[in-house]
């Protein structure tokens, strides 16, 4: 049957009943289930409860557990805020149906087995073979066939209902009721596995309650552990769980359940001490004592009974004598039946070095009994004696207490205990008989070991009569093994020897040989007094014997001594040698044994360390891989979650968009939410394309089938509209005239109203002005006072503002002064830094100038001086090689302040000016070098010097021009003009032998005595000049000044400052104009 998501609840219920009548229960169940899951009807009504009851009945009939679980969770969300009682009704009805069907299945299984047993005919071969192969009885096979499916269904029902109702305060009572029914189910059908799972499920639910106790926005109906009702329900449920575990004899689960009960009691006690009732403690200790007895822990069994007796006594101040006697007798018998050494770790724990684990277990068990320290037998006996347990116990328990704790009669203690035990008849007391016999036998054995050094086996049998030979021998061995007594069985002499054993080849005596006392029995039973009495009697008897036979004994002793002396003298060397040999043999054996033991221990320790290291490395590797895998999975999960959230957001936006409503209607909301956004977009695009094509097709069809009748109707309608328009145009003037008449009448009426109002105002105007003047006169003083107050307030505000402004100006001047001082200090530091860098640069230049430069080769490219590619000029006459001469020395100029310290600005190319294009003044000189000329500096200097020498030698001297005498470009430094040539030969330096050495122009003044001052004087104008000014005229000779100084170590591309003209060539061009 196809699901119907939008069917009304009433119709769905009616439809389901109709389907049930025709035998289609499965279809009816699907119909009801779809109605419960439908999102349209989310308001609870009574019809929903009827639907759920019918749904649960069908689920039980068809064994559809998963549908029942899904429907119950849906119904919980529906009734959580409205009617929780309806949910409880449905759950109870569902469980009753499941329990009834399970009981019916059990009865049916028994009836089928009985039916088979009543047949007169024998078993057929098939049944016999099945019985042999399966190895089970007929009832077991029938239970597996008929009962097992319903048991599984009922167990799933309980578990699902508990999962449904967990951590919900509204249905907490029903939750605990179902839990107790579940325990009854496990006990009735002996479902041990299900009982363990149920206990684990309840523990998990409690952990979740504790985890989410204070978590915000988790569950508004969560169970609160501060509620006494909730704690009481949980405590009662855990006690029933403990009782069920004991009845099913699941002692491990009983112990865990006891821990759960203890935890609940501690939690309740922390919240409110009055929450836990004394009766609960009595029940708890009773069950816990039974668990300890089944576990074989008689020490804690007795401690639990003692705690129960104390609480029972406090709960009933005046309880009857019979009740007190019964409880005290049981406590006393349980305490006396505690064996020796029950509170100490076993031999296995000592040998395996796990005594800490034993102490931890003792502490844990003590916590379960609410004891601050671990109990001991002596402690329990003292506590019992303090509260009067021996006095309140029965006569049998009293007699046993006196025999075992207050009497020293080693030869008849066991017989007396056996005679008393024969009078015990109650079943709850008979369980202690065997333990009491073992305690009495050990007690008698200890007392005998104190008195005798050796005793025959037959006498031991008579002293301890209630054991066989084998059992008695096992008792002696166990007592000696647990170091209760020091005894050895001598089978050759058929006796038992007490005391320490002799030293053997394996080492010294046992550790227990150093212990002289035995668990405090010496002080309790008077052993020390008996020993002293026997020693005194022995001393007196010995003295009496020696007094009666003194002479005879003296002669015998002397004779015996003489014989021993003779024998000693005869065998002394042999005995001495034998003793030494035996001692040496023992020492060697002991050394070898110790060495072997040490080697084994070292080898074992090394092997253990290797195994531990390997295990540790393997564990670290596993943990590392596990962490990496977990991190990868976490990142992948985060990515998947992000992608899922993005898709959900996209689908939600699409769902809100009206464009995608057609897809939602066709696919359904659930299927639409599961779709991929890309798929939705692709499908919507296909739909739009399809609709567009359909629309285009229809339009084309309409164009073909144009309706001419409609066109004719439109033409007629146009004529009608034209007639209506003409009629309205003819009536428009009349309507306008009527509107104007109405408007004029309205204006006239308004004017008359205004005139009337003015007349009324004119009548009272003088009186109004008189009243206003009188009011002003009456309030003249008040007005003047307010004006004076306002003036005073205004003056105060004005003075305050002026004071504030003055203060602000004062602060501003102070801040400006501070900032100016800071700027001055910063500028001073910068100047000092620049000066320091200049000194460093000067030292670097001096160091570099000391080394000569390599002369450039005279190639064709180097002799090409027409770098401006101007028209070819006439070649100069050939020159002869002449040595270079240094120019005249210039006096160092004085320091001119911060202007000399300013760093040179970087070269900036400027557009060509008129002076750049004027080449008239260059008619007698070589063209100047452009900033971007990349030719060799050394070759250019050589060429300029030679050219100037030729010109000075051939041309007559010329007067200095305005460009030579102008000093604006040099900032006040007048260029040095060479004197005119005369016939007198000029003084020149003597020619040096060997190849001519080239001297850079910026070093000539230094060689001539100019020093560093000239270099500094020449570099100042270049640093302070404007970068947009054209180079000075001495650039025509291609001479360069010293390299720049400052932060930038690269050579500057603009021209150097002017230097002295030592060639006599002053030039004839008027260069003053381009320097301005």
From Swiss-Prot:
Q: Which GO terms describe its biological process?
A: egg-laying behavior; embryo development ending in birth or egg hatching; formation of cytoplasmic translation initiation complex; translation reinitiation
List, alphabetically, the Gene3D superfamilies matched. Answer: 1.25.40.860, UVR domain
Question: What domain of life?
Answer: Eukaryota
Short name of any one Pfam family annotated for the protein:
eIF3a_PCI_TPR-like
Q: Does the keyword Coiled coil apply?
A: yes
Region Disordered, annotated ranges: 600-641, 826-1076
A single GO CC term for this protein reads:
multi-eIF complex
Write out the biased-composition intervals (Polar residues).
Answer: 918-927, 1060-1076
Question: What InterPro entries does the database record attribute to this sequence?
Answer: EIF3A (IPR027512), eIF3a_PCI_TPR-like (IPR054711), PCI_dom (IPR000717)
Composition bias (Basic and acidic residues) maps to 608-641, 826-857, 865-908, 929-956, 964-973
Q: Which UniProt keywords apply?
A: Coiled coil, Cytoplasm, Initiation factor, Protein biosynthesis, RNA-binding
Location within or outside the cell: Cytoplasm
Q: Which residue ranges does the record assign to the PCI domain?
A: 324-503
Query: Which chain positions lie within coiled-coil regions?
Result: 574-651, 678-713, 776-843
Any one GO molecular-function label of the UniProt entry? mRNA binding
Please report which protein family the annotation says this sequence is part of.
Belongs to the eIF-3 subunit A family.
What's the subunit arrangement here? Component of the eukaryotic translation initiation factor 3 (eIF-3) complex.
Which HAMAP family is this protein grouped with? eIF3a
Function field: RNA-binding component of the eukaryotic translation initiation factor 3 (eIF-3) complex, which is involved in protein synthesis of a specialized repertoire of mRNAs and, together with other initiation factors, stimulates binding of mRNA and methionyl-tRNAi to the 40S ribosome. The eIF-3 complex specifically targets and initiates translation of a subset of mRNAs involved in cell proliferation.
Question: What name has this protein been given in UniProt?
Answer: Eukaryotic translation initiation factor 3 subunit A
């Amino acid at each position: 049957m196809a699901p119907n998501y939008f069917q009304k609840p009433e119709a769905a219920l009616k439809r389901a009943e109709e389907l049930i009548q025709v035998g289609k229960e499965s279809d009816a169940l699907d119909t009801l289930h779809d109605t419960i899951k439908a999102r349209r009807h989310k308001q609870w009504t009574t019809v929903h409860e009827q639907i759920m009851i019918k749904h649960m009945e069908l689920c039980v009939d068809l064994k559809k557990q998963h549908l029942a679980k899904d429907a119950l969770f849906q119904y919980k969300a529906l009734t959580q805020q409205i009617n929780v009682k309806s949910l409880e009704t449905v759950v109870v009805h569902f469980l009753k149906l499941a329990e009834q069907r399970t009981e019916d299945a059990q009865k049916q299984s028994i009836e089928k087995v009985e039916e088979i047993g009543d047949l007169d005919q024998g078993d057929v071969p098939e049944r016999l073979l099945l019985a042999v192969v399966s190895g089970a009885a007929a009832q077991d096979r029938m239970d597996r066939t008929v009962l097992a499916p319903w048991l599984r269904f009922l167990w799933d029902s309980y578990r699902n209902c508990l999962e449904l109702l967990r951590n919900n305060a509204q249905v907490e009572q029903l939750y605990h009721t179902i839990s107790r029914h579940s325990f009854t189910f496990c006990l009735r059908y002996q479902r041990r596995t299900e009982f363990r799972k149920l206990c684990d499920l309840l523990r998990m639910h409690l952990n979740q309650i504790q985890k989410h106790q204070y978590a915000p926005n988790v569950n508004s109906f969560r169970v609160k552990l501060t509620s006494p009702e909730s704690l009481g329900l949980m405590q009662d449920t855990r006690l029933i769980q403990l009782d069920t575990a004991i009845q099913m004899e699941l002692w491990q689960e009983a112990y865990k359940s006891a821990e759960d009960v203890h935890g609940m009691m501690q939690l309740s006690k922390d919240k409110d001490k009055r929450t836990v009732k004394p009766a609960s403690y009595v029940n708890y200790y009773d069950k816990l004592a039974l668990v300890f007895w089944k576990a074989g822990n008689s020490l804690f069994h007795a401690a639990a009974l003692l705690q129960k007796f104390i609480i029972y006594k406090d709960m009933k101040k005046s309880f009857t004598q019979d009740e007190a006697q019964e409880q005290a007798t049981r406590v006393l018998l349980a305490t006396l039946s505690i064996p020796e050494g029950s509170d100490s770790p076993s031999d296995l724990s000592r040998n395996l070095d796990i005594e800490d684990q034993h102490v931890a277990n003792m502490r844990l068990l003590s916590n379960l009994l609410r004891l601050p320290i671990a109990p001991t037998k002596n402690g329990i006996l003292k506590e019992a004696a303090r509260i009067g347990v021996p006095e309140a116990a029965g006569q049998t328990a009293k007699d046993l207490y006196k025999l075992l704790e207050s009497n020293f009669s080693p030869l008849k203690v066991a017989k007396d205990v056996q005679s008393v035990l024969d009078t015990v008849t109650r079943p709850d007391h008979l369980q202690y008989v065997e333990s009491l016999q073992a305690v009495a036998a050990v007690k008698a054995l200890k007392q005998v070991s104190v008195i005798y050094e050796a005793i025959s086996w037959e006498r031991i049998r008579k002293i301890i009569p209630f054991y066989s030979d084998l059992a008695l021998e096992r008792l002696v061995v166990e007592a000696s093994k647990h170091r209760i007594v020091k005894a050895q069985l001598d089978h050759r002499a058929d006796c038992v020897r007490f005391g320490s054993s002799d030293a053997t080849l394996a080492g010294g005596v046992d550790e227990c040989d150093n212990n002289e006392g035995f668990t405090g029995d010496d002080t309790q039973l008077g052993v020390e007094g008996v020993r002293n009495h026997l020693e005194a009697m022995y001393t007196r008897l010995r003295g009496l014997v020696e007094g009666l036979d003194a002479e005879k004994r003296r002669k015998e002793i002397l004779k015996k001594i003489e014989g021993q002396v003779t024998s000693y003298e005869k065998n002394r060397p042999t005995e001495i040698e034998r003793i030494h040999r035996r001692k040496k043999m023992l020492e060697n054996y002991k050394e070898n044994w110790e060495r072997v033991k040490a080697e084994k221990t070292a080898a074992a320790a090394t092997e253990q360390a290797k195994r531990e290291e390997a295990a540790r490395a393997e564990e670290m590797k596993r943990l590392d891989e596990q962490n990496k895998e977990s991190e990868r999975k976490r990142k992948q999960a985060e990515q998947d979650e992000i992608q899922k959230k993005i898709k959900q957001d996209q689908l939600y936006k699409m769902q809100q968009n009206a464009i995608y409503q057609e897809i939602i209607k066709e696919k359904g909301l659930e299927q639409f939410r599961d779709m991929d956004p890309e798929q939705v977009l692709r499908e919507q695009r296909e739909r739009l394309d399809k609709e567009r094509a359909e629309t285009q097709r229809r339009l084309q069809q309409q164009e073909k089938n144009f309706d001419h009748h409609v066109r004719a109707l439109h033409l007629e309608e146009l004529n009608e509209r034209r007639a209506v328009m003409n009629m309205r145009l003819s009536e428009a003037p009349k309507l306008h005239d009527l509107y104007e008449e109405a408007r004029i009448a309205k204006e006239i009426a308004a004017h008359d109203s205004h005139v009337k109002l003015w007349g009324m105002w004119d009548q009272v105007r003088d009186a109004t002005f008189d009243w206003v003047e009188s009011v002003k006169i009456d309030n003249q003083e008040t007005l003047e006072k307010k004006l004076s107050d306002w003036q005073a307030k205004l003056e105060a505000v004005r003075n305050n503002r002026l004071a504030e402004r003055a203060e602000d100006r004062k602060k501003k001047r102070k801040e400006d002064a501070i900032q100016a001082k800071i700027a001055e200090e910063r500028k001073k530091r910068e100047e000092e830094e620049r000066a320091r860098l200049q000194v460093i640069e000067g030292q670097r230049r001096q160091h570099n100038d000391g080394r000569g430069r390599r002369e450039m080769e005279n190639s064709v490219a180097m002799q090409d001086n027409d770098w401006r590619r101007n028209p070819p000029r006439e070649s100069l006459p050939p020159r002869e090689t002449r040595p270079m001469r240094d120019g005249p020395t210039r006096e160092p100029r004085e320091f001119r302040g911060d202007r000399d310290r300013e760093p040179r600005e970087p070269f900036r190319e400027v557009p060509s000016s008129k002076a750049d294009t004027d080449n008239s003044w260059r008619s007698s000189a070589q063209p100047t070098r452009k900033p971007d000329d990349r030719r060799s500096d050394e070759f250019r200097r050589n060429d300029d010097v030679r050219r100037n020498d030729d010109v000075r030698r051939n041309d007559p001297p010329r007067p200095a021009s305005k460009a030579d005498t102008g000093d604006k470009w040099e900032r006040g430094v007048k260029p040095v003009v060479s004197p005119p040539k005369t016939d007198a030969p000029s003084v020149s330096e003597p020619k040096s032998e060997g190849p001519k050495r080239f001297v850079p122009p910026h070093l000539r003044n230094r060689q001539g005595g100019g020093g560093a001052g000239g270099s500094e004087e020449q570099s100042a104008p270049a640093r302070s000049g404007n970068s947009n000014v054209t180079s000075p005229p001495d650039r025509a000779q291609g001479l360069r000044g010293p390299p720049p100084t400052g932060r930038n170590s690269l050579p500057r591309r603009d021209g150097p400052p002017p230097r002295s003209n030592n060639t006599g060539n002053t030039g004839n061009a008027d260069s003053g104009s381009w320097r301005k």
